[in-house]
Amino acid sequence: MHILDQVDAASLKQDIPAFRAGDTVKVHVNIIEGSRSRVQVFQGVVIARSGEGVRETFTVRKISFQVGVERMFPVHSPVIDKIEVVTRGDVRRAKLYYLRELRGKKAKIKEKRDN
C-alpha cells in the first residue's frame, strides 16, 4: 500500500484554494477539440464535496437559461486549469441537495460576512 500512497501523493495538486459547500466558484476547464485546446469557465455554487485524496470530487450547480446544470469535477484533475472562489456562502449543511427543488430567490445563498 505504501507504493499506492506515494503515487497518490505525487498526483495531488498543491494550488487548490480552500472552498466548501455554499461557496460560488469559477472552475477553469481545459477542453481539447481536435488539435486545438481552449479554456471554458463553469461558474456556480458548490453543493457537495466528497471523497479524499486523489479521489476527492466536488459538485457545482448553476442555472443556465432557466435550466439547472450540475457538473461534478475531480479536485485534482489535470483537466482543471484553476479554481477561483468568487464568494463565500453562509450555509449550515455539508450537502446542499435541497437547492435542486428551490426556484428564484429561495435558491439564493446568503454571503458570509467578514468580521
Swiss-Prot record:
InterPro entries registered for this protein in UniProt: Ribosomal_bL19 (IPR001857), Ribosomal_bL19_CS (IPR018257), Ribosomal_bL19_sf (IPR038657), Translation_prot_SH3-like_sf (IPR008991)
Function: This protein is located at the 30S-50S ribosomal subunit interface and may play a role in the structure and function of the aminoacyl-tRNA binding site.
GO cellular component: cytosolic large ribosomal subunit
UniProt superkingdom: Bacteria
Gene (UniProt): rplS
PANTHER family in the cross-refs: LARGE RIBOSOMAL SUBUNIT PROTEIN BL19M, RIBOSOMAL PROTEIN L19
MF terms (GO), sorted A to Z: structural constituent of ribosome
Family: Belongs to the bacterial ribosomal protein bL19 family.
GO biological process, alphabetically ordered: translation
Name of the protein in question: Large ribosomal subunit protein bL19
Species the sequence originates in: Leifsonia xyli subsp. xyli (strain CTCB07)
Record's keyword terms, sorted: Ribonucleoprotein, Ribosomal protein
